């Protein structure tokens, strides 16, 4: 039962093959048995089972919706009433929110049962989930490897079938890269599609929540519940609600032959995504996936995203600048850890932040404060914003000749734990294919498409699919067609 997808579990609940309480108990038992992965930072069985009992009561009355009784885990960046909400930081080690994030509230309103809070890089700053105050997360496929970050706890939980689905957030690739490393499906929606209210902020012009699950169809179900306008989030976009499942299983164009359902689909391949730095084993898996798309009737079209390399310096100016502002609220007075011994008020600020923040967070706060300082604001921050606009324009130019863009989610498979901890630049380079999508505010997703080679043969590869603004339903259709033709998304780690 634990290996079933959300769609399959929904059918099992409807057929009364199991109850919501039995499902919750099953996953809680698995979470407890897999503590060594360190995927979860807070579990409360009593709270979970109370929600499951309420879901069973709804189902018994013939009420409830598509997600009622289905379990989900939440990344610990979403504040969740009753559970600790720490953002992976000592600064918030024992913080409990008096309210739920909109994402959490909407999924609970849809009847989903919260299994617990997943581990993450501190304040979502990292690509390996080694920056957490609660310890590193291990990749279920190879426990010597990282699971990706910053949503590494969520990706590991779904991969190990400790939860059928989880929420994540993506600022520069933090859903897509860990989904790639852990062999699960994850989608970052268009910026503003999912409410940021109650999501502990890193970089406000980039942060976006999204689902992680076994398949594109599961992600579509979750996105139906998660998305929508929220007046409490000033970046939330007013658009009519839509059904993200509506194109699943449908041909790209009416009248397409059953054997060529994607005839007419134009897939853009950026030259910049297939050059130096892309590992051979990742390239081989991506090429095989593209051939599968051709077999389904799609056409491959060369495109160019000439500012791809600039996305790294642009991101690491803008994101730290916004982080330095957002994290100024954690001062030991209003929120978070307070030093036990200090002299005056200023000394308390300094010691509380020095003790509460980890090295990577401190590094980014310092960088952000520097680029916003007098004399550097114009030279760095404003210049980065100008290039960001050009990056977005490059995508629009590419979409004139294609419907979706594809390439690797990451230049390599997951690396060993500790391999890049002393070299932040190498860590930053791991997000080269995802950063530009975030800077442009576009939707993107990663779907499993193979494995590495040699010593990396157990480490998954993810195919990145990028859509134009608000084109998630079509993007999910394209991913779903691939998953109907292949079984990479059904593969599980040994012992699972």
Swiss-Prot record:
PROSITE patterns named in the record: AMIDASES
One GO term describing the cellular component: glutamyl-tRNA(Gln) amidotransferase complex
Pfam families: Amidase
Residues forming coiled coils: none
This enzyme's EC code(s): 6.3.5.7
Reactions performed catalytically: L-glutamyl-tRNA(Gln) + L-glutamine + ATP + H2O = L-glutaminyl-tRNA(Gln) + L-glutamate + ADP + phosphate + H(+)
Keyword terms: ATP-binding, Ligase, Nucleotide-binding, Protein biosynthesis
Active site: 75, 150, 174
Entry annotated with the keyword Ligase: yes
SUPFAM superfamilies in alphabetical order: Amidase signature (AS) enzymes
BP GO terms, sorted: translation
Superkingdom of origin: Bacteria
Gene Ontology MF term list: ATP binding; glutaminyl-tRNA synthase (glutamine-hydrolyzing) activity
General function of this protein: Allows the formation of correctly charged Gln-tRNA(Gln) through the transamidation of misacylated Glu-tRNA(Gln) in organisms which lack glutaminyl-tRNA synthetase. The reaction takes place in the presence of glutamine and ATP through an activated gamma-phospho-Glu-tRNA(Gln).
PANTHER family the record matches: GLUTAMYL-TRNA(GLN) AMIDOTRANSFERASE SUBUNIT A, TRANSAMIDASE
Protein family according to the UniProt entry: Belongs to the amidase family. GatA subfamily.
Subunit structure: Heterotrimer of A, B and C subunits.
NCBIfam families, sorted: gatA
Full protein name: Glutamyl-tRNA(Gln) amidotransferase subunit A
């Amino acid at each position: 039962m634990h290996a079933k997808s959300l769609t399959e579990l929904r059918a099992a609940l409807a057929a009364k093959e199991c109850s919501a309480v039995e499902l919750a108990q099953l996953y809680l038992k698995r979470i407890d048995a897999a503590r060594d992965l360190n995927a979860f930072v807070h579990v409360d069985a009593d709270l979970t089972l109370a929600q499951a009992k309420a879901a069973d009561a709804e189902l018994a009355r013939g009420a409830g919706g598509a997600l009622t009784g289905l379990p989900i885990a939440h990344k610990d960046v979403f504040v969740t009433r009753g559970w600790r909400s720490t953002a992976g930081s000592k600064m918030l080690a024992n913080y409990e929110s008096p309210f739920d994030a909109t994402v959490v509230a909407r999924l609970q309103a849809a009847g989903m049962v919260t299994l617990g809070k997943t581990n993450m890089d501190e304040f979502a700053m990292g690509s390996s989930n080694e920056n957490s105050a609660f310890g590193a997360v291990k990749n279920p496929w190879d426990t010597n490897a990282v699971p990706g970050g910053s949503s590494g706890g969520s990706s590991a939980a779904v991969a190990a079938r400790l939860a059928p689905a989880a929420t994540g957030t993506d600022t520069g690739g933090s859903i897509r890269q860990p989904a790639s490393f852990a062999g699960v499906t994850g989608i970052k929606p268009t910026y503003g599609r999912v409410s940021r209210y109650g999501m502990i902020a890193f970089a406000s012009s980039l942060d976006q929540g999204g689902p992680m699950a076994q398949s594109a169809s599961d992600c579509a179900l979750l996105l139906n519940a998660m998305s929508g306008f929220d007046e409490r989030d000033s970046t939330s976009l007013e658009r009519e609600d839509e059904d993200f499942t509506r194109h699943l299983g449908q041909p790209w164009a009416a009248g397409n032959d059953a054997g060529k359902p994607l005839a007419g689909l134009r897939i853009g391949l950026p030259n910049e995504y297939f050059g130096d730095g892309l590992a051979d084993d990742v390239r081989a898996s991506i090429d095989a996936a593209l051939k599968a798309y051709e077999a389904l009737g799609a056409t491959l079209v060369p495109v160019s995203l000439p500012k791809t390399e600039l996305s790294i310096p642009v991101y690491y100016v803008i994101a730290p600048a916004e982080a330095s502002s957002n994290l100024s609220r954690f001062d030991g007075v209003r929120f978070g850890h307070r030093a036990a011994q200090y002299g005056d008020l200023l000394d308390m600020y300094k010691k509380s932040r020095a003790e509460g923040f980890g090295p990577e967070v401190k590094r980014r706060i310092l960088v952000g404060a520097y680029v916003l300082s007098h004399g550097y604001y114009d030279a760095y921050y404003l210049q980065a914003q100008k290039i960001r606009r050009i990056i977005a324009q490059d995508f629009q130019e590419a979409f004139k000749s294609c419907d979706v863009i594809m390439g690797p989610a990451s230049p390599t498979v997951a690396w060993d734990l500790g391999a890049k901890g002393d070299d932040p630049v190498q860590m930053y380079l791991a997000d080269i294919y995802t950063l530009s999508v975030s800077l442009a505010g576009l939707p993107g997703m990663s779907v499993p498409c193979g494995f590495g080679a040699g010593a990396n043969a157990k480490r998954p590869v993810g195919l990145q699919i990028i859509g134009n603004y608000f084109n998630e339903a079509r993007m999910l259709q394209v991913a779903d067609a691939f998953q109907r033709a292949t079984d990479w998304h059904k593969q599980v780690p040994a012992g699972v």
